[in-house]
Amino acid sequence: MAQTNKPTEEEPPAVSTSFEELQLFADTFDAIRRGYVEDVTDAELFEMAVKGMLTSLDPHSAYLTDDDYENLQESTEGQFTGLGIEIGYRGGFIAIVTPIDGSPAIDAGLKAGDVILKIDGTSTQGMSTSESSTYMRGPEGTTVTLEIGRAGESQPFDVVVTRGVIDVPSVRSRELDDGYWLIRVSRFQRDSGREVTSAIKSALEKGDVNGVVLDVRNNPGGVMNASVEMASNFLDGGLVVYTKGRHPDSMNTYNAEPGELLPGVPVVVLVNGGSASASEIIAGALQDRGRAVIMGTQSFGKGSVQTVLPVSDTKALKLTTSLYYTPNGRSIQAEGIVPDVVVERAQLTSLEQGNRLREADLNRSIELSLIHISEPTRHPL
């Protein structure tokens, strides 16, 4: 999940880079300018260096060009032109975390865990997610050819996907049985919390609600505040999630609004390996608060918060600044939410669990055992 902040105005910590390290950078920069097989401008090299610093930190930190930033805004609003996939890394290549419901990716048969080896003949090895987005996005109706590696397949194969407008409602609901409702949340957009509220109120208008199944399988997350708003439908106030990081600005608590809509009504939350980020926030909160039974398979394990820091009028840094914690103090980073009831094949589609990509599989995944949250400091990140 990403939030937009202004750069802090506090005095930054002293730079400890040695002369030798700076000289290494300068020598490398000069060697590339002089000897690389193709001409590369100084501006291009500096941009590559910034990208490299960020992408080497973890899978979610990134350098955002104007197009990247526009893409980020589009994804939170719920409409963009592309393939309809959430991506990460596996083995140095771009991989599909989950395809979005109703997207061209679903129509083309792409699956969670598929590794994208090439995009229109260009290898994705070492390619950043921002670069891959540039290759995969394009005008509606145009096509892109992906070379796919899939578990269980002996050879890579090509999949042709026709780009389309991804404008899928994030919330759908239907009555399963007399008074028992399924609410399917495919991603967390700005209005998703309010959409769930509307779905519940609509169900109540039809009669008694005896139980709710909240389905966040294959939901990659999105806007954190939407998950907090959504939790307010099932909790009568109290803590939903809190965040901690190195900087005081990263220490925040998020509470549900009082006045839940379904007091005493049983709730089941369905999760699987494609449930990430905001999906894990609501599942973890309802689990810790004793408000729902979590059912399915272990979730993805993305427990980090990214802050968008503008560095110019058109460019920004997306930097991992904190981890989020469930009401009982659990960090799910690389661990995921473990269901109360494990149902191995409780899946939205016929995906095999073994093909799933999880946060722990992503390159430079933040290992919880290596993270030390120090005493709050007044220095910016």
Give each language-model segment a name.
Residues 306-309, 315-352:
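Conserved P-loop NTPase
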Residues 14-21, 33-42, 95-98, 103-112, ...:
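Cleft-lining beta-strand/loop regions that shape enzyme active-site pockets
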Residues 10-61:
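N-terminal activation segment of mature serine protease catalytic domains
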Residues 371-381:
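Single conserved hydrophobic/aromatic residue that forms the stacking wall/gate
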Residues 354, 360-370:
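Glycine-rich phosphate/pyrophosphate-binding loop
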Residues 48, 60-98:
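PDZ/PDZ-like peptide-tail recognition elements
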